[in-house]
Amino acid sequence: MIITMILIFVLGYLCIALEHKLRIDKAAIALLMCGALWTVLSLLGNDAQIGTQLIEQLGDTSEILFFLISAMTIVELIDRHGGFHVITDHIKTRNKRKLLWLLSIITFFMSAVLDNMTTTIIMIMLLRRMISGQKERWIFASVIVIAANSGGAFSPIGDVTTIMLWMRGNVTSGLLVAKLFLPALVSVIIPTAIACRYIPDENAHPEKLDTAPKLPPFVGPRFSHFVLVLGVGGLLFVPIFKAVTGLPPYLGMLISLGVLWVFTELVYDHKQNMEESIKNRVSKVLKHINMPTILFFLGILMSVAALQSAGLLTDFADFLDKNVHEVYTIAGITGLLSAVIDNVPLVAACMGMYPVVDTAALASSLDPVYMQAFVQDGIFWHLLTFCAGVGGSLLIIGSAAG
């Protein structure tokens, strides 16, 4: 059974890595892999509790998926109402080096609240308006991708992996920001400083200045600003909600989406002269959410959960403990692998291999110094968050932003 499950996972992940050559969406492969792994585990595992384990794992995975669906809807709603124009339209500098620094810093902080792919798309759209040279665009785009990945690494809502670690209780929002903000910022400053050497200290000459994006029909600046404030405020509300109530973050995100949904419905109900077809209601925006990505996360996370239920991840963790026994090396290898392999299954696998160590387990451990790294907010979780996030910048295929 173990060999069969390993072969299914390796073959499935190989197909995911080659999705562009195979011309098969990775979500379809992930769902098939998930179904195959759980079927093999059920038929050959001889475990009467397999149904219960499946429900428990699906519950944990669904929390992450509901969080992502709500967050993606909020971001899409802001974008549909031109909310991000408030940020991009205030960039007035034309000096290329100043523009590079400005774009990298804005991207860094935006991706801490939004997901890194959305942030990258917004900044690349702005870049195309301001920089005409193809080679210079590549340099600017590379810095933007690095800044987006680094910005998502220090925020509990900035990347799927940080969301996973935060929601499962591996890290807390306050210490995550406190420990990783400076390392993440340095990981942006150094590449930007190097890239500046390849950018001439001169003003940009955009080819088309009339291509600046305009607000959607019947959406005024005031309405656009309100949607932006409510949306971003709702995203920032989630960590506060979890800290105050102790309830799961996905519930706070659902509340934020509900508030924004009610607000936009009330506004559109008062726009009697506006055609229904051009109203960006949430029910319409939901049709444009990237559901294949959500289904990919469902398939890949449940596939890793199957390996965990089979005991494979625990066995691999024991192997690393005996032969490596060094959290810096394990996290570093994970970071390097994230340049080639999607960081979501990598982080999910590490979470399955190393459960959060509580006080009782730490006290009874034969090596409490080593196990201290795996407590909540332990050094391993912060290293894993940073390495998996920033490591995706090493290659263009290493992250969704790239």
Task: Locate predicted features.
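Alpha-helical transmembrane segments of multipass membrane proteins
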Residues: 13-17, 35-39, 108-109, 193, ...
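Hydrophobic transmembrane alpha-helices of multi-pass solute/ion transporters
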Residues: 5-77, 86-94, 250-302, 312-324
